[in-house]
Each structure stands twice: as structure tokens, then as C-alpha cells.
């Protein structure tokens, strides 16, 4: 440290003491960021020199390297951060360090905007609020700044203990180098910050991709570089090799395999930002963990800000890995807390539209490859359908969703595919939710639809029970569950070949009067167990099924809410009976000939139990079900 003369003690601006306490004790929740802030300020200083040297070449020696050097003195518990950037004179030190939120960087940007905006592209500035420097007082009992401004020969020292005052002095030496050197007299308990590996970790985490090299001066006087040569996302797309992508993907994704899709874009519209995002080819094991956070890192001019509070990527795109870098992102006084404002929302909308657009292109061009993505992340993507959004945006999201159906066997279809195949007399998009494809394909609910060639979507992800209660239509075509009891399938064309006999079987043996009387009897027997008993218009092979009235809650959704203690009752369902099924036909004959009987009563209860089991509903009384089953079986001749 050099000697000084002409010292002058000055006070910080009004209320600075209170603000300084806020910065030290409240604003920053992570002490590591003090070094990030000081490195960012040093990078700003190098940016300023590089810019001003364009019009005044004497400010910078030809071929000299702009750099940042970190060194330590473990015996004195001191940390040093040096740069050979623009430097500061006495006036700069007082204005920029004596007044919080009086940012030299901000003033510099204003000067560019007012006079030399055509060259603004060469300047990338980080700090906008002028308080990052004061985060040094979180770890230091005293901060000393020695600086000499480019083009000047006199250097100055700024010194403060963060107690409301600072001392400004002139450096004695007439051989002062251009740039700034910051000395932190660390508090005893902050000795970890003189450890080389600790410093390297902080630089790697926060400042790995800034414009200028960051060196650590080791015990031998050798400079070891701590950061990367360049941020990969600043390169043109065609300049990044597959190997570079793979290496960077492994760094940010922490999953195996190769990226399934790479999204590298630079937006230069009203809001400028760059995104380098990857979609993995392997599903992370913790994709559905409730504490899982977004894995997209936020940078401001290549300085890492956070990945914990990024609101730019919605939860339903949490499988994205990579970075977003912008100079337009607003920050609250600290770089740690992002403002939730219109700029962030605009970036979010732009990013989401771009991601959905690329997914749609892939789905339309290569459904086999897209199926791999959908198997990994389709259920996550559908979570977005449950969120509040305008119709246009929701339909964009639905357009990239793919579904199984009764028409497609085991291949995926889009809702556009479904609508194109709808029958002329069909007004709804029909769907059925279930646990898995194998079981849902055997559901009695599908029989009438399949026999008439009406396509039904087969939805087997847990999230399907939720979004189908939010999304009511697509392209103005209503979505409708096949479990609705009032669905009339008679308007559709005759059953397909091979099924005619099923629909016509016994049609002359059962009169409507006999059926109606039996239905009335069944409703009387089952009384409080069902809300109604009716003849089914959709069953062809099964004797019975459960149904719900239009407007009632879906069976699976109601069960989920009960399990989550969000619903404290169980609604009664409608029992639909296939009057042409052999079992039901015999029961009708027996009732017509002999009237009520214990056997018929038991069989009706067993059929209701069967319908409940097929829908995943709990039996109201398992012991009663077993007793009735044994009673019926005991009468077999």
C-alpha cells in the first residue's frame, strides 16, 4: 500500500449510514456476492476504458491486456482486487463511492445515450445501481480503494470503515499505474475469503463468463486464470461445435445423455436477451419433486445472478436447462432479487412462444423423435394447461401436446388430428382418464364409442384429471368426458361390421315396459347407494358402468380431492345398465316372472360393486360385498 498526503475526512451523503446498514445487513443474503460485485465493477471499468480508447488511443497501450487480478495476504487477513481499467480520480471517488445509488456506470450509460449511441454495442456494463461496492462491508472492517484515472498521472486513495465517513487522500508516488486496486481488511470471522479455492469457487460460480480474464496471483507470483475464455452463448450458432454444446450442457444440466434439442437465440427487439437452452434426452429423477427448482441460470452481461428465483421460465417448462443473458433485466438494488415487472413478463412470453414453436416444428416433422420427448416431459408440459392464461396462449400449448386415442393404437396424435377425423354429426372431443393404457382400453365406458367408430382420447397421466377440468374446448370444439351419463350415441352411424349382432341381440325379447319396471326395481334396491339407475346408451359388452351427470365432478377428480382431504363427502353416482347384456336380460326375465327376490337383490349389489371396482372406487362395505358374492355362488347348481 502506498503512502498518502493531503488527506481529507468527508461524510457520506445524507442518510447513507442507514442505507449502508441496509446493504450490509439486509440487502444481501449471500456473502459470496461481494466478490461478484467487485469483479463486476472491475469489468465495468475495463469496458469504459475500451470504449473511451476508441476515440482516444493514448488512454490504452497497444496490445495491453485488460484484466482483473485477485490476490491475498493470509497473514494480514486481506483480500485484494485489482483491474487496469479506466480508473478514478479524486472527483470520481467522491461522487461514485461517497454517494450510494450515484452510479458512475449509470452516468456513463447516460453519456453514451446522449452522444455516442452508435458505438454502444462495444460496451457491456453490469452495475446499474451503484451499491454493489458497499457489499464489501459485509466481510471487511475496512475498505481501501487506490485508483489512478487513465490519462492522468496522480492517484488517489479512498478509505472507509463503513461508519458514515470516508477519507480521501492523494497517493505520494508519481509512478502510479492506471486502474484500481481494492484492499479489504477482512473481519476475523471472514478468513475463508483469503483461501484460494474459496475464491476460485466464487469466481467460477458468478463471474466465469465475463468479458475479461480473472487471475489469481499465487504464492509464486504467478497469475492463474480462474474464468473461461468466452461465454459460449455469445458465439454465433454455426461457430459452436457439437463438443462445445455437449460440454456446456453437462455443466448446466447435471444429467446424462445428450441434449435432445438446442435452443440458441439472440433477441434484438425492444428487449435484448440471449438464450441458450437445452432439452435433455433423459428425464431427471427429481422432475416431480415438490422442491425442484428451475435449472435455468440468469446472467446479466455474462455475470451470473441467480437460478433460484428466476420467474422467466414457467414451472411447466422446468425440464429446460441452460442460461438466459440480458442487459435489460431490471434488478432491485441488490442483484439477488429480481423485480417482477413487465420486462420480465415480456421475456417470459417471448421465450415460451419460441420454445413452443420449436416443439411444434419437431412434432410435425418427426413424430417418432418427438414421442421420446413426450414420454419424458409430456406430463410436465400439460401442467401448463392448468395455469391461468389467455385462450390464444393456451391453444398454442395444447397444439404441442400429444395424446393416445382409440384410433391410434400406441401412437400419439394431436387434437388437430382428432378434429380432422371427427364424424359429421360429432360436436365434442371425447376423452377418458385412467391409470394406464392397458386398463383404460378395456374400460366399459368406451364400448359404445368404439363400436360406432367415434374416437376417444385416452389420458393416463395424473395431470390429465386436472387440466380437463380447466380446458373446456379447443378451437371452439368442446371437450367432453365419456363418463357423462347423458351422452346419446344413437345419433352416430350404425355400429361397425361385426358388432351389429351385439346391438341387435335380444332386441325383440325385451319390451320397453319390462325394462322400465326392472330399472325402477333396481333403483329401489340400490336406493341411497346411487343417485339414479338408467338404461345405458353406450354399453355393448359390459352389463353395467358408473356415470356422472353433466356438470358433476369427474369421478377421478373427486376421489383425488377426498384423498387430499380437500373434500369431505362422497357423491352418489349414476348406475347405467346394459339391458341387452345376457346377465341383465336374464335378471329382467326373472323379475318379470317372479318379482322381487333375494337373488336379484344380491346380484344388483354385486353389479354395482363391479362398476365401482372398474372405476377405481372403494366399495362401501367390503364384507357385505363378500357375503352377497358367497350367497350367489352357493346357489350354483
From Swiss-Prot:
Q: According to the UniProt record, where is the region A? A: 1-335
Chief location bin: cytoplasm
Q: Which InterPro entries does the protein's record reference?
A: HATPase_C_sf, Heat_shock_protein_90_CS, HSP90_C, Hsp90_fam, Hsp90_N, Ribosomal_Su5_D2-typ_SF
Question: Region C: what ranges?
Answer: 560-637
Task: List the subcellular locations.
Answer: Cytoplasm
Q: Which UniProt keywords apply?
A: ATP-binding, Chaperone, Cytoplasm, Nucleotide-binding, Stress response
Q: Which PANTHER family match?
A: HEAT SHOCK PROTEIN 90 FAMILY MEMBER
Protein name in the entry: Chaperone protein HtpG
Q: Which organism is it from?
A: Ehrlichia ruminantium (strain Gardel)
The protein's gene is named htpG
